[in-house]
């Protein structure tokens, strides 16, 4: 289909004056309920209206654009031409309760950028990126990721930011305005965001549980617990490592299989509830409180990561870890699976397709430079990933070194016992002094043995290899809760470093949870006027609902379901949602038309390359990623690592057939609103392209919108006046 700019007038500007708006306790936005404020004198009001008219006229004179009548001018002219009578000032109780002025703004652009960065800095994305770097090509994967980030990630992030900011709508309503027939994509993104929010705080509850246990000395995952009424260690723990035992048996109380049910784990219910209380407390007072909390939640992990990185550079094995960081497998550049993994990671790290990006951007002025914001957020996110991955590899190098040292010492003890028992000849006696660098001393001794003695030794002991141990880093949450916690226990003082590490993860998790919940709360407020006036009631109700539903994932088998959704399922609906978003802007609204509107709003030209990326390259790349992942999913069975209580070992099990059926069912449910809303539009004869011009356009939200294209300077002026209007509510209502 064509993506040419339409000759009709734009729909982008002035949406904040006519669309749904949120009442919030931030500067420049309030819900006015004081009846006295509605009865200002006509003389005072007229004077203020004249000042407003003069300001708008000055803004029009400064631009070369054809003069257009803005909503503010229409209100001003109407007010100046007629005296505000007592009857017009009077409002019914019903109308008075619905007086909601301008949508709130972020207190500063810094808060907004930090909110977007905090939403994208999910702990799971950080450790998954490091895991993929380690196991999917090294620097080759990193190069592919960076290429995909700027080719696909930044344009799509810019698209969502521009849509939300221009339309002043959350992730559910914005697409109804841009493309009525594709309006169902907003409902799909809302449902995906809701499902993600159900289990996201469960991961945060794991972090809080570990943090609460880190005050013990030694930390409980450093040594096996003693059996009750005995001086011996727990035999189940002795058959594995303390960190693995603590993860499965103490933290998760994991079942042997996903089929095993059980009630919620009580030791996780309280941390889970605490997570929701913290997120609710941060959001209950709107953007004013959220913005201040974001400073701490985003900046604190950055300082901790830098401090950790400096500290780990001084550890033994850090150099080996950094050497593994720069390893590149050139053959993986030609592997489509690696490209699809990098593309999926770009979608996860940028957070597009969930509606949260558009919701956060909807609280910015329409003239804000969202293109530079998209680049800035992406670059900050990329730098955070690179620093965090470098820190990860330093820690893993230290962890692998310590484990290998202990392996060599254990082998030496085993060999001495076998020699004393006469099972090995005296020539197989290992070096006595393994205190300093035991791995080098042990390996040098082993390589110097005669071949027949060496063969006898290797049959009795395990191989101790630092490269092999380095590659044993676990996937998913276990990357942090197994490999990392064990490494922190090796680092004195282990209590301090463990607490700081989990504090960093918790801050990241909470900032991401705020972004996810903003993608749920904002669309509900935009859609239902009742929720705009009762924000606190909405937040409490939604959080209680999600807490109750999320208890399902705190059961003994809950971690297996989280892996099913996060590693295998969620990327598919996100790709479909993003593809339809590009269709909405590129085909229904028109990519060139959208860019032309943004050029006027922002006051500077935007590269026409986006008019080619959105309708052509991005959808094709996303569909290739979708097909590649689908083929990989069909060819290779999906698996999960479970706990076998009989052997106290981790066991790789395939997901049962009903798990795949569950994925398909969930996918169908969240995608269903797209065709369903299309059918609704066809039945009600809603046009494919949004109407525009002088007449009102009725969007799928049934909101009459009269949109006029306004130059950048004028938009900025109206944004200033919009804040001024909140001081004089009668100005906005005297002509209604």
Swiss-Prot record:
> What does the UniProt keyword field contain?
Glycoprotein, Membrane, Neurotransmitter transport, Symport, Transmembrane, Transmembrane helix, Transport
GO-annotated molecular function = neurotransmitter transmembrane transporter activity; symporter activity
Signal peptide bounds: none
Sequence ranges on the Extracellular membrane side: 220-263, 404-495
Q: Does the entry feature the keyword Transport, yes or no?
A: yes
Entry's transmembrane regions: 139-159, 177-197, 199-219, 264-284, 290-310, 338-358, 383-403, 496-516, 534-554, 568-588, 609-629, 659-679
Example GO CC term: the record gives: plasma membrane
Q: Which residues are glycosylated?
A: 229
Q: Which GO terms describe its biological process?
A: amino acid transport; neurotransmitter transport; sodium ion transmembrane transport
Its tissue distribution reads: Highly expressed in peripheral tissues, particularly in testis, pancreas, and prostate.
Just give the chief location class.
membrane
Where is it localised?
A: Membrane
Topologically, how does it sit relative to the membrane?
Multi-pass membrane protein
Q: Which ranges does the record list as Cytoplasmic topological domains?
A: 1-138, 680-736
Family designation: Belongs to the sodium:neurotransmitter symporter (SNF) (TC 2.A.22) family. SLC6A16 subfamily.
* Annotated protein name in UniProt: Orphan sodium- and chloride-dependent neurotransmitter transporter NTT5
Organism field: Homo sapiens (Human)
UniProt gene name: SLC6A16
